[in-house]
């Protein structure tokens, strides 16, 4: 009994010690300080005027970050060295060096300083003023795509907005950049002058393929979107108390955090639905909002799946950005806050509290760093956190980017294993259901070595429009390339599953860059012996006569002949085409080095040298056009040059929505392929043609499929100067004349005149024979030796 009482007493004594264990152990980073070396701050010191701090990490380069507070610090090693305050060169003449916003794009840091945008290239340590901004701005916004080797991702990261937060939307100036912030242009939002309210922010919401504008009016906030189908109405309104900062969580999942000192809001679908973040303890909801909990936020940190909040009440809160309504739990109360403290996630489940420390002897600041292991903290039984119910969650598609082109599909697979005695509820989500649809199958796939059940999740994805299950008013435009993020998570996942991250991948519903078109060339001019391949490779050239080409592509004769060099390396041996047979190329679609199909979509041809000695077999009327068709003349005039007729500006004359009247039904129909049997008809000329081909059907592929190829037209003999009828009359006349002479000459010879003529011919023949014999005998006597001396033997 005494022993039991002793154990109980020791337990009660130890319990406060256990709960009093610090959340983290602090260490101070102090480097590069030598007493005989004096460091001086060069330039104008930047500062951030706010009672709260910001710590902005580069989403793709994890060691690069910017700290915004009373002092501004920029690091390339995660603050593992002492740093001088961040400055801007005095030569930039910024005036008041106050920073109001910052954003990373590639190797650039964009800073809004005194209402202007500056770029700092940290790789070359150079500053520049962004071009094109003519009015004051306060904020920049953008996103970063971290999938390497993708041109699409580069484009995403280069798109930036600059704007003045709080301005009336109808009167404000918004700027955009597609160069990563080097240059900006005015952005014209559709019907902007009619929008009532102030500007809370404008963002590229790539998870929805929309531009989203936060409209603030009468204490309410609503997101307005740029494109169909979301542009017909505003998102649901939410309370807008104070000035909210908007944080776009990394990963293009559509997760937004909106916060200021007394409010923390959360959206999973890029602002369409915005809800408060709840405060929970175990499964119990203590408060439905931060405002209700009466806490004051000092700083927040966000990564792809996690959220951390530090408050002025010296508390730390943590939550995951899961599928269920977002919530946070409160960690044990300890002294961790200071007015300069800021949070950042070092990695999944590893949180760091960073505090700059002033050194009285040196200009460089040290950094106090307090590292927290979230998984270890969640083991505290006082938090009432359930045990993780997932043993394994994996998919080969994570950290990869996929492309679904027009009429394509994608199949992905995930493997799930629950903890023994538990069950899982898998959930598959796409961030942009307006363009990407899917079908998922969940089934048992075997057992582990310890008898636990394995499950497999098969996911089939294709364009939402091709599933046939949605209304037109729900889907986005099929012609417009979009993107979406696929996420696989567990609906009943515990917050303790810190190391079990959702499976996520980025899917571009757009151009597959591996696709190309090739012109079938089974019968070439070289294989038939018409041309010599070696000769074509030896600086071969040909002449286009001035009557048959126009450098302006308007079908007018030129003033001089054109000398053209033939590029065998680019064109190879030309396709052989007989002049008198209507023709069109056989277009093949290839993906990398594999043949896919013969293209039956609509396309256009243009001779690159301006030759116009060919026509089309169909007219607008015979092609059954219901509206006036486009042609090269009008397209060149509209675009200002050739080779700009493509899927973006093509309008079919068979489209019922095309209201251009059919005024000239007899004009040539210059589109080949598709529903018509249109072909090229060549004039009576042999020679080379070098064609540019462009697939203009907007529903065949999101790619601009184009190429250049050559043909050689043969078989056109020189044009006869006399008509065939005249030749036939002359031939028949000569035959009849010969027959008549054969009949009449014998009859004439039997007459007296005929006998006299016969005698005359005989005498003439005898005289000629005598003269010839005399000349022959004279030549024989003289010999054959030339004049001069000759040695005899």
Swiss-Prot record:
Extracellular side: 21-725
Family of the protein in this entry: Belongs to the CATSPERD family.
TM segment ranges: 726-747
A GO CC term attached to the entry: CatSper complex
Signal peptide: 1-20
Keyword Transferase: no
Membrane topology per record: Single-pass type I membrane protein
Superkingdom to which the source organism belongs: Eukaryota
Function: Auxiliary component of the CatSper complex, a complex involved in sperm cell hyperactivation. Sperm cell hyperactivation is needed for sperm motility which is essential late in the preparation of sperm for fertilization. Required for CATSPER1 stability before intraflagellar transport and/or incorporation of the CatSper complex channel into the flagellar membrane.
Residues in compartment: Cytoplasmic: 748-793
Annotated S-S bridges: 24-370, 60-146, 145-153, 388-497, 511-703, 526-573, 625-653
Gene encoding the protein: CATSPERD
GO terms classed as biological process: flagellated sperm motility; sperm capacitation; spermatogenesis
Name the UniProt record assigns to this protein: Cation channel sperm-associated auxiliary subunit delta
Location in or out of the cell: Cell projection, Cilium, Flagellum membrane
């Amino acid at each position: 009994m005494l022993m039991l009482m002793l154990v109980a007493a020791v337990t009660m004594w130890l319990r406060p010690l256990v709960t009093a264990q610090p959340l983290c152990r602090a260490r101070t980073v102090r480097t590069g300080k030598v007493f005989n070396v004096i460091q001086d701050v060069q330039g104008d010191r930047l500062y951030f005027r706010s009672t709260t701090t910001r710590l902005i990490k580069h989403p793709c380069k994890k060691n690069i970050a910017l700290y915004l507070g009373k002092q501004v610090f920029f690091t390339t090693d995660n603050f593992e060295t002492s740093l001088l305050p961040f400055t801007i060169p005095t030569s930039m003449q910024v005036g008041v060096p106050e920073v109001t916003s910052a954003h990373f794009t590639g190797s650039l840091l964009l800073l809004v300083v005194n209402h202007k945008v500056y770029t700092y290239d940290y790789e070359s340590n150079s500053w520049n003023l962004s071009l094109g901004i003519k009015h004051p701005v306060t904020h920049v916004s953008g996103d970063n795509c971290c999938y390497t080797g993708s041109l699409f991702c580069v484009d995403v990261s280069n798109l930036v907005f600059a704007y003045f937060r709080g301005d009336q939307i109808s009167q404000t100036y918004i700027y955009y950049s597609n160069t990563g912030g080097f240059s900006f242009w005015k952005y014209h939002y559709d019907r902007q002058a009619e929008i009532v309210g102030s500007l809370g922010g404008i963002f590229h919401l790539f998870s929805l393929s929309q531009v989203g504008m936060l409209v603030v009016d009468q204490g309410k906030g609503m997101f307005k979107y740029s494109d169909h189908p979301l542009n017909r109405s505003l998102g649901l309104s939410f309370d807008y108390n104070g000035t909210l900062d908007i944080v776009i969580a990394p990963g293009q999942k559509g997760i937004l955090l909106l916060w200021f000192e007394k409010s923390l809001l959360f959206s999973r679908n890029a602002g369409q639905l915005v809800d408060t973040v709840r405060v929970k303890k175990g499964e119990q909801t203590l408060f439905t909002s931060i405002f209700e909990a009466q806490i004051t936020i000092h700083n927040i940190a966000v990564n792809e799946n996690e959220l951390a909040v530090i408050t002025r009440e010296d508390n730390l809160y943590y939550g995951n950005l899961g599928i269920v309504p977002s919530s946070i739990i409160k960690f044990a109360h300890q002294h961790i806050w200071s007015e300069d403290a800021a949070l950042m996630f070092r990695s999944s489940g590893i949180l760091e509290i960073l505090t700059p420390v002033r050194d009285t002897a040196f200009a460089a600041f040290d950094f106090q760093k307090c590292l927290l292991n979230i998984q270890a903290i969640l083991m505290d039984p006082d938090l009432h956190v359930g045990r993780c119910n997932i043993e394994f969650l994996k998919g080969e598609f994570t950290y990869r980017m996929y492309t679904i082109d027009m009429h394509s599909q994608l199949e992905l697979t995930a493997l799930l294993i629950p903890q023994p005695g538990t069950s899982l509820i898998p959930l598959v989500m796409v961030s942009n259901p307006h363009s990407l649809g899917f079908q998922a199958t969940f089934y048992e796939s075997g057992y582990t070595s310890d008898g636990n059940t394995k499950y497999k999740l098969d996911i089939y994805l294709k364009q939402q429009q091709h599933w046939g299950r949605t209304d037109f008013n729900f889907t986005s435009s099929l012609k417009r390339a979009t993107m979406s993020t696929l996420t696989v998570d567990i609906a009943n996942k515990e917050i303790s599953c810190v190391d079990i991250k959702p499976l996520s991948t980025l899917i571009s519903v757009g151009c597959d860059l591996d696709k190309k078109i090739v012109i079938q060339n089974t019968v070439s001019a070289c294989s038939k012996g018409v041309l010599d391949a070696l000769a074509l490779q030896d600086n071969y050239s040909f002449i286009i006569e001035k009557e048959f080409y126009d450098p302006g592509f308007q079908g007018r004769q030129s003033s001089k002949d054109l000398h053209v060099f033939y590029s065998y390396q680019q064109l190879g041996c030309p396709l052989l085409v007989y002049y008198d047979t209507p023709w069109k190329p056989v277009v093949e679609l290839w993906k990398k080095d594999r043949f896919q199909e013969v293209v039956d979509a609509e396309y256009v041809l243009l001779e690159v040298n301006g030759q116009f000695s060919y026509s089309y077999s169909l007219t607008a009327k015979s092609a059954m056009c219901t509206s006036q068709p486009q042609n090269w003349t009008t397209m060149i005039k509209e675009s200002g040059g050739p080779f700009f007729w493509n899927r973006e500006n093509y309008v079919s004359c068979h489209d019922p929505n095309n209201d251009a009247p059919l005024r000239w039904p007899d004009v040539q129909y210059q589109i080949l392929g598709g529903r018509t049997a249109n072909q090229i008809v060549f004039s009576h000329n042999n020679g080379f043609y070098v064609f540019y081909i462009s697939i203009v059907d907007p529903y065949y592929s999101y790619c601009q499929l184009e190429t250049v190829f050559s043909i050689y037209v043969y078989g056109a003999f020189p044009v006869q100067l006399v008509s065939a009828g005249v030749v036939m009359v002359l031939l028949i006349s000569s035959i009849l004349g010969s027959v008549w002479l054969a009949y009449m000459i014998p009859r004439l010879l039997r007459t007296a005149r005929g006998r006299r003529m016969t005698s005359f011919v005989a005498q003439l023949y005898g005289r000629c024979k005598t003269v010839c014999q005399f000349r022959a005998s004279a030549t024989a006597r003289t010999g054959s030796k030339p004049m001069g001396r000759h040695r005899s033997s």
